[in-house]
Amino acid sequence: MKKALLLLAAAAACAIALPATAARNKTLKGSGRIVTETRDVGSFHAVEAGSIAHVLVGDYPAGRVTVKTDDNLLVHVQTSVAEGTLRIGLADVTVQNAELTVYVPAAGITRLDAKGIAAFSLETPLAGITGLKAGGAAKITAEHPLQTNDAAIEASGTAHIAVEAMTGTLERIS
């Protein structure tokens, strides 16, 4: 009797949880109509990107980012700063056939963290980098050598980090 009640309770919990999860993460298809929006985000020293974000780090105005994406996805793009970290990604949706490019100022950045299939392209020399981290199928590439005294580089999954560094101490964590 106890087993039957336990199984019934577990089945009821699954029946409630599965539709709630599916509703929270709906799938959107990119419209193909690309729009651009500039957002004031304040100051930050680290950037964390997830989802399908392609983040271009370069000589852009400080304190703001520019988001380029399909018009129907713009409201789902998160660009928020908490504890000095700019977080970029999509909120509560998965996407198909979509673009998400975010232009981020290089000034003052010390740490980059790419997750999922996010990609960072470093367009300008960066000084003072202390950490690069990529997980999942994420990618970090740099057009110019990084200038740093101490840096930790960590890649997991099928992630790829391709950078040159002029450094005092470089620690590779895999």
Regions found by a protein language model. Name each.
Residues M1-S174:
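Intrinsically disordered, low-complexity terminal regions
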